[in-house]
């Protein structure tokens, strides 16, 4: 999967289209990512010792990795490619040519 935790991405599809945020978690087995402030859902929590009343908590839901594009340091969104630099495999932005790792 071309997206890693900590990458800055732009959402390119869905209700949050155009949003730029940071990847909080990558889920490679299901090809999904959790992006900060995107795809918020309301989760009902049962009452417990910490919260005797229970609560409705907003949290980020995973979105499919095909709905995001990785941004480079200059904010250019593009597809991700791989190349070998100094004997090390690195990711780079195909549009700008800038190395991401």
From Swiss-Prot:
Keywords: Ribonucleoprotein, Ribosomal protein, RNA-binding, rRNA-binding
GO MF annotation: an example: rRNA binding
SUPFAM superfamilies: Translation proteins SH3-like domain (SSF50104)
GO cellular component: ribonucleoprotein complex; ribosome
InterPro entries per record: KOW, Rib_uL2_dom2, Ribosomal_uL24, Ribosomal_uL24_CS, Ribosomal_uL24_KOW, Translation_prot_SH3-like_sf
GO term, biological process aspect, one: translation
SMART domains, per database record: KOW
Function: One of two assembly initiator proteins, it binds directly to the 5'-end of the 23S rRNA, where it nucleates assembly of the 50S subunit.
Assembly and interaction partners: Part of the 50S ribosomal subunit.
Membership in a protein family: Belongs to the universal ribosomal protein uL24 family.
NCBIfam families to which the protein is assigned, alphabetical: rplX_bact
Name of the featured protein: Large ribosomal subunit protein uL24
Organism, scientific name: Streptococcus agalactiae serotype V (strain ATCC BAA-611 / 2603 V/R)
Gene: rplX
